[in-house]
Amino acid sequence: GKFNNHTSIFETLLSGFPAGTVSGAPKIRAMEIIDELEKNKRKLYAGGIGYFTPNNEFDTCIALRTALIKNNKFYVQAGAGIVADSKPEKEYLETINKAKALMKAVD
């Protein structure tokens, strides 16, 4: 896409986060609910990872499954897509399975 010449490449990228695919809709209310329900801030999880070139080109992706090692502790974040006909138990198991895959990778 193209962006406004009065907007920096970083402002352009940041305007899209958090991505609707991980926040839900309507976005503002969904983000309020996330803040109410989730014990920890998402930080890297659901954020953008990528690179920028001197020619104002960039390529990014969304961090959907993340692991962080800090102070000898291993933190894992994973999620599932909740929609109107989701079964809570199945979504929970999907999240656990995704997290287990991260833990197995470093085992």
What does each model-found stretch correspond to?
Residues G1-D107:
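Conserved hydrophobic core element of enzyme catalytic domains
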